[in-house]
């Protein structure tokens, strides 16, 4: 392998985007941010997501994943509607608030094809993007055939180790995360190789608990000991689904591989337009599931959503979603009460 090619690195003056905020020991609310324009009816229910400046993402989201780094050959990234300098400035705004901005690699429609020998070139490109835009880490969001296509499973982890070690040498912490669909986390699942290769390097895993229809988890002790299949699309059992699937993953039981609880983040859709299935109708299901996990000594790191843009989108009838996800779960994750929450509760009391 060659060394880091510093001719690819754009020298930047020390600024807020040069920071790499720490998420160690912190609960996180993570949201994906769309790097493409909205269409008239992009949602699963024909709604429309909001185009949002990165710096306008609500502060409840203390980790923002920019979607996506992709392309043939060595994948890359370019802001779709602002200059490189302006994008870096906006990353700096979030960094100055202690918020991390990750670059997400892949996406549902991305064809990523890495070959043996591209470890260093990929590491060089990631470093170039970090130095250009101020990213604080990389999120692996490979889906479908891209997960194990070509040499992706060996080249990508090797490149990320080079990048993380590079920034560690500068006294910085480069974040590595993943957002796999949960069926790929069974004991023989496609993502297990990434977990093993990046053991000791990854910071958190945010499985997608959505778009999986009737897939779920078999719980032998449920149903009075007779066992029960608890499916992702069973809204009546949503709390149990969130609890048992998470418990299975953080303990490595019921056919799933183990991810430490303090590195585990539940991924949920912002609303019914953001995913075909998986939306949580009653938010108390999330709060109760998290409480049950904590009581069992398995408190997790936080929640993730697809996406911040959908969180402020509109329905088919142009009814605003009005940041429902961050309003619901920001206070739950960060342990603070917001003015919006207090106002809503006051209005609720007056209406009684």
Q: Which positions does each model-derived feature cover?
A:
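Enriched but not universal
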Residues: 1-12, 341-352
